[in-house]
Amino acid sequence: MAQKSEIQKLKEEIKRLKESAYKDELSKLYNRHGFKEEAEKFLKEAIAFQKHPERRESFLVKNFALTIFDIDNFKQLNDTYGHQAGDEALKTLGKLILERIRDIDLAARWGGEEFILGLIGANENDAYNIADDIRKKIAETKFKYGKKILKFTVSGGVADFSQAKNFEDLFKLADKAMY
């Protein structure tokens, strides 16, 4: 019985360590490493379907799209109100993203003020609609910082896997679409 308890403790510790290695503590989303590892699995499945649809009758993932968001004028927000205000903006965007995507989709804080979504089964048009919904919702969302009520906007870019050979290609396409 003691052995089972020790095994359970080890499993829980492994789970905790994996979460801390793959999650961004501030936004509660995946970090870059965790997102990329998960996204590559789905992307490989979508590419396999595209290249060889005859190999199987059903595929888990037939489409995969990325959406990248960047908080507009984030440096100015930090410089004007302080880093805690910037942190609140990051938390607000992370929370709003999670409210607007499905449980199967992926979301990460890619770094700094940049966020990325992996939309499972989505084509470019689907991704655009989701990105536009998030962009509009953020534009109308206010967050409280101390006694101040602040707001911010985001810019985004989308791309689907159809023109990409790998994750890096797909990321570059979505990043380019942002500008």
Model-derived features with residue positions:
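Short helix/loop segment flanking the catalytic signature motif in cyclic-nucleotide metabolism enzymes
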Residues: A89, I116-K136, D169
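Catalytic-core segments of nucleotide cyclases and related cyclic-nucleotide turnover enzymes
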Residues: Y128, D132, G146, D160-Y179
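Short catalytic/binding micro-motifs of nucleotide second-messenger systems
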Residues: F49, E99-I104, K136-K147, M178
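Signal-transducing coiled-coil linker helices
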Residues: M1-L26, R32-Q50, E57, K62, ...
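Heptad-repeat coiled-coil signal-transmission/dimerization helices
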Residues: F35, A39, L90, G94-I97, ...
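Catalytic core regions of nucleotide second-messenger enzymes
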Residues: S58-V61, R109, I138-V154, L170
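Hydrophobic framework residues that shape the active-site pocket
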Residues: F74, L93, A107-W110, F115, ...
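Conserved nucleotide-binding and Mg2+-coordinating catalytic segments in signaling enzymes
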Residues: E19-E37, F69-G82, K91
